[in-house]
Structure formats: structure tokens, C-alpha cells
Amino acid sequence: MAEEQNPSATFDTILTLDFGSQYTHLITRRLREIGVYSEMLPCTQKLADLPFKPKGIILSGGPYSVYEDGAPHADPAVFELGVPVLGICYGLQEIAYRLGKDNVVAGTAREYGHADLNAQRLDNQGHVDKLFAGLEEHVKVWMSHGDKLVKLPEGFHTIATTANSEYAGIAHETKPVYGIQFHPEVTHTPDGAKLLRNFAVDICGANPNWTMSKFVDQEILRIRKLVGETDHVLGAVSGGVDSTVAAKLMKEAIGDRFHAVLVNNGCMRLNECETVAETLNKHLGINLTVVDASKRFLDGLKGVTDPEKKRMFIGATFIDVFEEEAEKIEALAENSGAKVKWFLQGTLYPDVIESISFKGPSATIKTHHNVGALPKRMIEGQGMKLIEPLRELFKDEVRQLGRELGIAHELVMRHPFPGPGIAIRVLGEVTPERVDIARKADHIFISMIREAGLYDKISQAYAALDPSKAVGVMGDKRVYAEIIILRAVETTDCKLTLGIDGDFVLRYIISVMTARAFPFDNEFLSKCATRIINEVHGVSRVLYDISSKPPATIEME
């Protein structure tokens, strides 16, 4: 997305500068949840290079000590721009350290976990009391720091304390500059969203008008301007939420000049191709081509048992198949005097964040591309250009956008499905027969979850096929048949797992998203097992995986 066309060109924006915390992205998410648009950039960002002026700036937490050589520091222009500034944890220490090198020291006692915060009111002090306005005098907050502010910077008031932090909250006497030692962005700070709203709306004056209804209107206009009146766009779809929403958005913007391609790799869910074709083509009006390459994929998977080799083969073959179909579509377009100049990519904001997150003083910021999913002509620079209409959105915003575009609830709320499909849910060798068993068992399991009204309460659910077999008794005969493993999990993106990193600064490792097995009752699981064994030929046993993540992963391979 061209910078000048970012939502920041239209919506009041709070800029979050990332100092390396693994939950900086939650600041951005919480602000958007209250209707204020926010963008995250690395702390090395030079404000002079910004294409917009933020309404306010938030300095995130981080795993460093501000007084150490090589510690990251914000552009001095942050404090010269004339907009409100809020420092969180490391951000508080950054504000204090720049005003006095002895203001921050290594703490004698680390403070992490829940803490009782006492907010202090300073009457008749103008902006000073605004940060905690509407909050109780005593509130629960989440702390995770080792270093400590031991001196109040000149010109600041104390606005909050805890038993271990004399300066848990500070505010400048005359300027809207604030610092807090706790983390308002996590759910462990119950009133954190209120505090962030106080800062963004009441102190910064940001208009809380960030909605998907306004975004979709702006994005359609942007796409039309970018693509022009004659160029065509090509994109791969899978039936998943991201690709479906991106495809529908493109359809709304340029109509039949968007060409969607669905590749059947032989490892999709039961009736998936037919369902996706009906949804995208008939109901959403998307120009869709379905390529049945199932035999090509399954033949190539014979004898392959290593999960990574499965992924690599499926990924490489997908690119080959997609490329072949793309050439046909391009040829047809050229026959009518048009050209396919753009490739639709379903990049989301978390993908962008992963690329721009601050990883150290010498880290190189790279442009995010999911290279494994790009056609060769994109990699080799043969002319097609990327268009990424969802790259500024979080997953929950993509779902909201889907609803705004009229996509059915059942499709918008679909569980994630891995790119390699059932191939990585069939443990061991992938054969058509084994895929069929896993596919049918999965269909029964998901159908029963839907019938029980549990689907939207579960983050992901599926049936996998174990590489071993087990003895059973059917019709008074001994059988030696397949084992099905059922898995269903609840996940959260903001439940903190404590871990010490660097100078005892505690971080939550977002790449290890936590998940726990969904607590089905035994009667439900028993019914699932009975149906699968009775209806799927070749299955003698059904197990339920109760492992949490970590240490287990959500997928089997």
C-alpha cells in the first residue's frame, strides 16, 4: 500500500513506537477497538520521514535498559513535535532518562504480575489529571519491569504509585507528556482501555471514527485509483477468511477485472471446492477459476512422511500450478486488449508488524512479502505488482470487514485451515485413502460442533489421522484399523506468560500464542467417537488431544 494512501491520511492516528516489547501490537489493537486508528513503527523511525502528523505518540515497553550502551532511544523530535506523548514501562524510563541520566537504575526487586495502583489527583492542574479521569483511585494493573524510576524528572508530577514503584505514573506540569510503569494494553489491567481512551481521545483529541464501514469506502476508492480503469488483478483464494474478504473487496472495486484462482491440492476439506465455488462465484459474484490438481499433488506426496518436506512440496507445486493458470488468464486478458498487472496478496497487519518490529539497534527493516505464496514473476520482477488491501488490518478487523461486505457469518467466522491442508493432519505418509478417512472424520467432528452451537466458541478444531493403527472389535470380529485424533482449542492473543528476558525485563512471547484444549463434556466426545467409528470405514479408535500450547502446537505437523 502506498504510504500516502494509508488510513493515516484520512483518520486521526496515534503512532505507537515499538522498543521491542512482544506485546506492543496490543497497544495498537486496543486503540483500534475503541475506534481510534493507530499504527506501529519501530522506535528508530525518524518523524521527519512520516507522511502524516500523528495526533499523539506512545512509546512502548521493551526488553532493554535505557542506561546501557546500545539501548534504543526515540528520535528527539518526538518531544519537539508538539503532540501528547505517553511512555509505557520502558517508554516511561525513556522519558525520564533523557531528562536525567541518574533517574533510572536497576531495581533491587523486580516487579511483575498484578499490582495495586493508587492514582493521585492534583486538582486544578489542567491536563495532569486527565490520564486517570474516570478511573477509581485504587485500580489493578499489570507490571513487568526490572529497572526502576528512582527520581522524579524535573517539571513532572507523580500521578500514581504502587507498593514498589514510587513513580508508577508521572505527568509533566505544563506539557501533555505522561509516563506509566504498568501495561494498560493487556487484559490483566482491567481499566487499561479506559486509560488509553483518555489519552487518545481526551488528551490527544483523536476522533474515534475508525470503523470498517468507513475503511471499506476509502479502500475501494484507493484500489480503483491504483489499478486504473483497464488493468486486471489476479489472486489465489482458498476459501479462508482472508482470501475471501480480499477477493470480495477487489470484486467491489473493479468487478470482473479481478480473477480468482482456487487450486485443489487433493487435501482440502470435504466438498470444499464445490462450497467455495458456490460461495465465491454464485453468491459473491467473483470471477473464479477452479483448477483440479489433486492427482498431481497426491502423486508427489507418495512416500513422503517428513512434515517439512510435505510443506515444501505442496508449496512449490502450488506455485507451479498457479503460475500455469496465471499464464492462461493473462493470455485471455491480452486477447481482449487488457493486461494482468497486479497480484492480490492477503497480507494482514500482524505480518507487517513481524517485519517492522524493533529487533535491535542494528536491525534492518524489511518490506514484508510472503515469498512462499508469490508467483515466480513477482519474485523475479517480471512485471506484476503487489496489491495488499488488508495489510493495515488485524484478523478481527478482517472479519468485521467481511460482514460489512455482506459475506455470510459462517464464512467470516471459519476456523483457520493450513495451506498444506489435510496433508499435515495425516501423520506419516499421505495417500488418497488416508486423506479420505481424515477428511470424513473431520467433517463429522465439525458438523457436530456446529450442531452443538460451539463452533464460534472454539478457535480451531479438526480431526487428524495417527500414523499407527489399533486393535478393535466390530461385528464380533477383531479388526486392526486407523486411529483418529480430535483436536479443538481456545486461543488468546493477550494472555501473558511470564518469562525473564535481558535484564530481568519480563516479556510475553507472542509467537507462542497460548491455547488450551476446549473442555467438551464426555458425552459429546463419546457421541463424536461413535459417529466417526460407525460412519468412517477403517477407523477403530478415536482420541481427544487435551494438550495445551505450549508445549504442544495447534497443528500436528
UniProtKB/Swiss-Prot annotation:
XMP binds at R311, D476, K549, E555. CDD domains: GATase1_GMP_Synthase (cd01742), GMP_synthase_C (cd01997). Keywords: ATP-binding, Cytoplasm, Glutamine amidotransferase, GMP biosynthesis, Ligase, Magnesium, Nucleotide-binding, Purine biosynthesis. The active site is at C89 (nucleophile), H183, E185. GO terms for cellular component: cytosol. Homodimer. Residues 210-414 form the GMPS ATP-PPase domain. HAMAP family: GMP_synthase (MF_00344). Its EC number is 6.3.5.2. GO terms for molecular function: ATP binding; GMP synthase (glutamine-hydrolyzing) activity; GMP synthase activity. NCBIfam families: guaA_Cterm, guaA_Nterm, PRK00074.1. This is GMP synthase [glutamine-hydrolyzing]. ATP binds at S238, G239, G240, V241, D242, S243, T244. Inhibited by 6-diazo-5-oxo-l-norleucine (DON) and acivicin (ACI). PANTHER family: GMP SYNTHASE [GLUTAMINE-HYDROLYZING], GMP SYNTHASE-RELATED.
